[in-house]
Amino acid sequence: MLTKAKLLRMSAKKYMAKKQLEFFTTQLTEQKSEALGEIEDARQRLRVPPECKDEADRASFEMESQLYLRIVDRKSKLVKKIDFALRRIKTGEYGYCMETGEPIGIERLLIRPTAEFCADIKYINDDKEKHFAE
């Protein structure tokens, strides 16, 4: 089995070769399974409201409900990104910047396996987004 350490030591010539793609497919599949489990857990908690006998109980339940709704939303978005990354693996586009076509880099993919852009382009896009928000 390919480890993170071995992955980092591989030569640039082997970038996104079969073993690396298998490694990231496994990582992404595990992340997806975990996220789906968290979504299901949050939905279960939302389905079974506790008996709220007073205002404090109702307020507490409302706060918890908002938290679980945010979890469902955030994890659902992650699942979509994971599915997109898995499709990119199948098409041979995974690991390459969607804007420049340059390698994203193993280090960045280990931190964020769903990365779609190299660090430079991501920084530029984030900076543009920040300026539009101001």
Over which residues does each language-model region extend?
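Short Cys/His-rich "knuckle" micro-motifs
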Residues: E107-I111
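Cysteine-rich micro-motifs
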Residues: A115-K122
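Short cysteine-rich clusters marking metal-coordination/redox-active sites
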Residues: C97-G101, C118
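Residues immediately within or flanking Cys/His clusters that coordinate Zn2+
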Residues: S76, Y94, A115
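Short functional micro-motifs and their immediate structural scaffolds
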Residues: I104-G105, D126
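Short, well-ordered alpha-helical segments in soluble proteins
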Residues: K122-N125, E129
